[in-house]
UniProtKB/Swiss-Prot annotation:
GO terms for biological process: negative regulation of DNA-templated transcription; regulation of smoothened signaling pathway. This is Actin-related protein T1. Belongs to the actin family. The keyword tRNA-binding does not apply. Negatively regulates the Hedgehog (SHH) signaling. Binds to the promoter of the SHH signaling mediator, GLI1, and inhibits its expression. GO terms for cellular component: acrosomal vesicle; cytoplasm; cytoskeleton; nucleus. Keywords: Cytoplasm, Cytoplasmic vesicle, Cytoskeleton, Nucleus, Transcription, Transcription regulation. It comes from Macaca fascicularis. GO terms for molecular function: chromatin binding. Its main location: cytoplasm. The keyword Transferase does not apply. Gene3D superfamilies: 3.30.420.40, Actin, Chain A, domain 4 (3.90.640.10). It is found in: Cytoplasm, Cytoskeleton; Cytoplasm; Nucleus; Cytoplasmic vesicle, Secretory vesicle, Acrosome.
Length: 375
């Protein structure tokens, strides 16, 4: 028998990303735990009850030499279901210390998430974890909520995908969503390749963690890349101390690498860059709301944290929009957690209680219930 009072308990919130999973409890100002979305399975089978057969998150990355690393979320979509189940189990039991059967669960999902993935998420939560209530919230809608808005355009860029999502009165407009499959992971790989191509000789192997760190600490978006190249050619623009103590110096690579967000053709990807994505998404919307979207552009996701990105986007969107169009870009300092924070706010509201898909609903209608109830 379903007990409706279980929906009064603070919800567990999972913001599942290609690179990081953010987990916490509704009503809090940020996620309690942020872990790498990776599982490591032992390369050699060692049947022993005392030995972990797999490792999760940072621990898996530390032991990468002895493990096969699996990333269950690719380009924002769950593809490795067994590993994803293990990751959620780890978050429930070891990170949050909660019993899934005693708290409802909200998960964020990417725009245009395929039906089969949405239904599989519901099936797994209700059947494998016995949750009393479940909801799928559009990642961009949740991020916009964190900015106290219900109408606007969210530019979201994480580890696996970059997208522009127009939202009107709390609902995303799927026909106008634009996606670019260039994001944080591609920039890290591009950085590694560019450094080796430019003849950098590293005293230690440049692994992904070091490359990521260089990207996050030193890379930036140039306001005018061609001018920057003329101005800085041959100059040292930044230095980084490797784990073994050696210091390496960088030049033009620091702005050339993230430039792929605005010019993806540099990676051989024939898609519009960030500024044209924004313009294209807005132009696909009804003319009556276009100005409202330009007036509330919200940045979300860790890959939007590059210094200079907000200014460059503003400059180019102004050039693409009709003359005199008021444009505002909001770039919250904690925008890497925007979707999680928005979901926390959403689930804290008393009106949200009626939104939950309950275990009784699932039992009566099956997996298709999420198609009707989660927008």
């Amino acid at each position: 028998m379903f007990n409706p009072h279980v929906l009064d308990v603070p919800a567990v919130i999972f913001d599942n990303g290609s690179g990081l999973c953010k987990a916490g409890v509704s009503g809090e100002i940020g996620p309690r735990h942020v872990i790498n979305s990776v599982l490591g399975h032992r390369k050699f089978n060692m049947p022993s009850a005392r030995l972990n057969q797999y490792f999760v998150g940072q621990e898996a990355l530390y032991k990468f030499d002895a493990l096969h690393l699996h990333y269950p979320i690719k380009r924002g979509l769950v593809t490795g279901w067994d590993d994803m189940e293990k990751l959620w189990k780890h978050l429930f039991e070891w990170e949050l210390g909660v019993k899934p059967s005693q708290q409802p669960v909200l998960m964020t999902e990417p725009s245009l998430n395929p039906r089969e993935i949405r239904e599989k998420l519901a099936e797994m939560m209700f059947e494998n974890f016995s949750v009393p209530g479940f909801y799928l919230s559009n990642h961009a809608v949740a991020a916009l909520y964190a900015s106290a808005c219900v109408t606007g355009l969210v530019v979201d860029s994480g580890d696996g995908v970059t997208c522009a999502v127009p939202i009107f009165e709390g609902y995303s407009l799927p026909h106008a969503v634009t996606k670019l499959y260039t994001a944080g992971r591609d920039i890290t790989e591009h950085l590694t390749q560019l450094l080796f191509a430019n003849g950098f000789n590293f005293p230690c192997i440049l692994n992904k963690a070091v490359a990521n760190n260089i990207k996050e600490k030193l890379c930036y978006i140039a306001l005018e890349p061609e001018k920057e190249l003329r101005k800085s050619r041959g100059e040292v623009l930044g230095a980084y101390r490797l784990p073994d103590g050696h210091v390496i110096h960088f030049g033009d690579e620091l702005y050339q690498v993230p430039e792929v967000l605005f010019a993806p053709d540099q990676l051989g990807i024939h898609s519009p860059g960030l500024s044209k994505m924004v313009s294209s998404s807005i132009m696909k919307c009804d003319t009556d709301i276009q100005n409202k979207l330009y007036a509330e552009i919200v940045l979300s996701g860790g890959t939007t944290l590059f210094p200079g990105l907000e200014e460059r986007l503003m400059k180019e969107v102004e050039q693409l929009a009709s003359k005199g169009t008021p444009i505002k870009i909001t770039a919250s300092p904690d925008r890497c957690f925007s979707a999680w924070i928005g979901a926390s706010i959403m689930t804290s509201m008393s009106s949200f209680k009626q939104m939950w898909v309950t275990s009784a609903d699932f039992k009566e209608y099956g997996t298709s219930v999420v198609q009707r109830r989660c927008f």
